[in-house]
């Protein structure tokens, strides 16, 4: 088939991959930084600082998955039935995926887990984006401060090693 007749991809590849199983979610919950507001909780794990743990023939799924592909971040969505019916839950998930796609450069190298609360449905997209950006930038600032403190030998911050 000639190249002129071949259809181009209509959608670019998404800049994120999803967290796949309970152990990946649990790792982000345990080792990640968390931030809460009235609308959702955000758990962030910096994968560039995580040393890959390799056993016999076993690759660490979180840190190796970013290197294997051209994905920028890993995304997990945990939307409870308490948030609303399926239509409301799916709307929230679509909005959160869209936020990560729009701000892929900010999310680069992170594993993110969103846990929306029931009030999240009542936010419009722009208010949700504002809260997301505030939380993500404050977490990144806190992580940078904690990393500097760890390098100095100070452990008064709640930095995780």
Swiss-Prot record:
InterPro entries: Ribosomal_Su5_D2-typ_SF, Ribsml_uS5_D2-typ_fold_subgr, RNase_P, RNase_P_CS. This is Ribonuclease P protein component. Consists of a catalytic RNA component (M1 or rnpB) and a protein subunit. Keywords: Endonuclease, Hydrolase, Nuclease, RNA-binding, tRNA processing. One of its GO terms (molecular function) is tRNA binding. Its EC number is 3.1.26.5. The keyword RNA-binding applies. It comes from Helicobacter pylori (strain J99 / ATCC 700824) (Campylobacter pylori J99). The keyword Nuclease applies.
């Amino acid at each position: 088939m000639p190249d002129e007749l071949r259809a181009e991809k209509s959608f670019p590849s998404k800049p994120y991959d999803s967290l796949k199983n309970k152990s990946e979610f649990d790792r982000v919950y345990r080792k990640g930084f968390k931030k809460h507001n009235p609308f959702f909780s955000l758990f962030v794990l910096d994968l560039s600082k995580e040393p890959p743990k390799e056993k016999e023939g076993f690759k660490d799924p979180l840190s190796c998955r970013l290197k294997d592909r051209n994905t920028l971040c890993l995304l997990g969505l945990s939307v409870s039935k308490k948030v609303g019916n399926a239509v409301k839950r799916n709307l929230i998930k679509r909005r959160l995926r869209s936020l990560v796609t729009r701000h892929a450069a900010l999310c680069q190298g992170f594993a993110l887990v969103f846990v929306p609360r029931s009030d999240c449905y009542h936010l419009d997209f722009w208010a949700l984006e504002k809260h997301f950006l505030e939380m993500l930038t404050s977490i990144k600032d806190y992580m940078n401060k904690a990393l500097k403190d760890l390098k100095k030998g100070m452990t008064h911050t709640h930095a995780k090693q």
